[in-house]
Amino acid sequence: MCGICCVVALSSQHTICDYFSKDLHCHLRRRGPDSSQQLIKTVSEPSYECFFSGHVLHLRGLMTPQPLEDVNNNIFFWNGEIFNGVHVGDSENDTEVMFRHLALCSSEADILSLFSSLRGPWSFIYYQASGHSLWFGRDYFGRRSLLWQLSNVSDGAFCLTSVSVNSESCNQCQEVPASGIFKMDLRDCATTKSLSLTLFPWKYKCTEKNEEEIFIDVLDQVSKDLPNHITVVMNESKLCLSAPVIPLNRTISEASVEHVSSDSSKTSSVVSLETLQGYLAVEHKRKVVHQFIDVLDEAVKRRVLLLRRGEDEGTGQVQGVSPRKAHVAVLFSGGVDSMVIAALADRHVPLEEPIDLLNVAFMTKEQTKRTGTTKNCIRQEMKLDLHRGEENHKDLDAKMGDDLSCFDVPDRITGRAGLKELEALNPSRTWNFVEINVTLKELKEMRRRFINHLIYPLDTVLDDSIGCAIWFASRGEGYINKQGEMKPYKSPAKVVLTGIGADEQLAGYSRHRICFRKCGPEGLNKELEMELGRISSRNLGRDDRIIGDHGKEARFPFIDEDVVSFLNSLPISEKADLTLPRGVGEKLILRLGAKELGLEAASILPKRAVQFGSRIAKLESNNEKAYHTCSRLKLF
């Protein structure tokens, strides 16, 4: 995982400093703490200058500083993981492998073929010296962040970067659409003093749409938010990338339609394991569930094994913890998504290695109001502040149980229950349940210093709530229970697994029930297709920036290409049944899988969004809508 940045100045009136500030360098460096390197490429006739700044988090193979440059003056940035499609040896670094393959490409079609073959998250920037071309883009789902800052004047500079700075003085910043990959002819841009982007869009291998329809739709989508002087054109050869997944199966059985019309108004409120057992008694259903478990298991396996384990640098940074440190952590609420991921990770992470379960809670509002007079919560806030700034915690008061009651939010309660279920599943594993407690004071401070820059350019109340919760959770600083005492702990894991993608594909949100009631299974299919289509702009770039800020890498098993293709191959009736009550009907196939894995309690837990389960949504304001612009993210 890396922090990458490229600034191109097309005229002497604009300098690199217009875009690359000390603050931006700091944010990039936090993403890649293991290596930092900069490079400037100056070209005359026509005149332009390129500045490259690369920062590496070393996770696989040999340490490879970025940017890479070859004998032909080509320059390459890679922020990604190759999980399949192109062979990467155990001792190889995928950045070098990709650069080597790019050097062998002799045409645009070769480059598209290479990127079409990749499986895994990526964003990249590639300067092709011979043609003065700058290529860049994100994977099909946009699992790695890439932003562009485009000048408001036609002869200006522009910037591509993993993360930006939320500043009034900055040029407008947007997420690079995950609609395909882009190419810029820098020689032409410098000559005409204008910016023009050539797009190579994604296309399903089998689709009813012809190229012209695809091109029109994608161009409209990409162009709508760009300044008027910036043009986006389709490549002249009408070349496309091959989408790494199959289209959504929209098949709806007659039985499903009849079931909706007769039973949708009679949904029972009773949630029971017997309901799930009834489904599993049907041979076809059970077979599909096991196929799903198998494909998801492979996705988790790739994500927990493809990382450098080498020599241990110490332990989990607390006395008395397992002598081996954790390399893998899970964003953990105890809900069915995170429970299944943790259980599957347990199959593949070496047994002697702990797994960190990161559980975040925000101080309940009632306690926040009383912090001026309530000794327990004042003392707790002081201890949390000490915990953030001090390395030596040996003398910390062990009698913290009473004080921590103000963090007993819903996700903390379900998280503890989930821990017990995992411990029963594998008592030989060290499960570090990390209780991450956040006060209002610390929330405001960390939002001001870091989080508002990472959420940017997104700006809604929902982005703020989710972004803050994920930032504190993935930081991994909290407490673990050792022999009945709460001990300070900081997770050393560099890989963070997250369950995002399950709700989007398996009708997990409450809005899906509303859609189903209004429009039936046809409407639900359209909604789910839209969910996955917009996940790059709504979720994944933001989450990558948030988690990457700690020098850690987000990995998304539910958005593995094989998992998505498998789920897309199934009709909606195999994945969810929204005539059933909450806690069963949504994400039905996942709940059935959880029961088969032995996670019975988790299998019938209703969906609870992180902003509600962690209680951040109630900490600062109760009168906001999720889609409102968040005033707390604005600069003052």
UniProtKB/Swiss-Prot annotation:
GO biological process assignments: asparagine biosynthetic process
Disulphide connectivity of cysteines: none
Key words of the record: Amino-acid biosynthesis, Asparagine biosynthesis, Glutamine amidotransferase
Residue ranges constituting the Glutamine amidotransferase type-2 domain according to the UniProt record: 2-187
Keyword Amino-acid biosynthesis belongs to the record: yes
Catalytic-site annotation from UniProt: C2
Designated name of the protein: Asparagine synthetase domain-containing protein 1
Source organism (scientific name): Gallus gallus (Chicken)
Organism ancestry: Eukaryota, Metazoa, Chordata, Craniata, Vertebrata
